[in-house]
Amino acid sequence: MEIWYLGHSSFRIRSRKEIIITDPYGPEIGFKLPKIKADIVTISHEHPNHNRSNLVAGRPFVIHAPGEYEIKNISVFGIPSFHKNTIYLIEAQGIKLCHLGDLDYQLEKETLDKINSPDILFIPIDGCDTIGPKKVIKVIRQIEPKIVIPMHYRNEGLKVKEFLRALDVKATPIPKLIIKKTDLIFEGEKVVVLKRRKK
């Protein structure tokens, strides 16, 4: 599996044959979404910074509501949350990913039980309509992922530094994450910061 960060809350997740794009955004955000195509697009909520599936090529299957979906070899489970937000659990190649969308509150037990310790967690960190760097710690401890990837920030330096400082970890930004299920056999959690892909 290969994961690129496209900026804001958008990621490109490539499994063996399928490509998933999360929360494609419009130019209103201050930078452009790279030219991309996909098989599946997930939209956490209906806002131009998150729902511009029309900018994704390839005639993807667009998911913008809670529910269970099976597309090709990908399993997607959308969980409703506050702020008309959908949390997505995506399973591919035996790896379970959780995209929290615009989460801005602590999770309830029922939701935590559904999320159930994913391998990779995409979590918002900027505190603008979402949880901030300090509240992030509690949410991460609740969810117990193997890998944490921050998202939903515009200044690539400041918010990430606050986030890493709050967690008391160091992480050098990398262009992409390449991972397989056997790479996830370790204790504790790891933070991965991805550089925004501009092309």
Region spans (language model):
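Portal/gating segments that form or line small-molecule/metal binding sites
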Residues: 52-97
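Binuclear metal-ion centers of metallo-dependent hydrolases, dominated by the metallo-beta-lactamase
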Residues: 4-6, 147-199
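Active-site-proximal loop/helix segments of hydrolase catalytic cores
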Residues: 82-143
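Divalent metal-coordination and catalytic microenvironments
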Residues: 13, 41, 45, 76, ...
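Active-site metal-binding motif and surrounding structural segment of the metallo-beta-lactamase
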Residues: 27-68, 113-122
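Active-site environment of divalent metal-dependent phosphoester hydrolases
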Residues: 12, 27-31, 46-52, 105-108, ...
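Conserved beta-strand hairpin/beta-sheet module of binuclear metal-dependent hydrolase folds
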Residues: 1-29, 84-101, 120
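Active-site metal-binding loops of divalent metal-dependent hydrolases
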Residues: 24-26, 45-46, 81, 100-104, ...
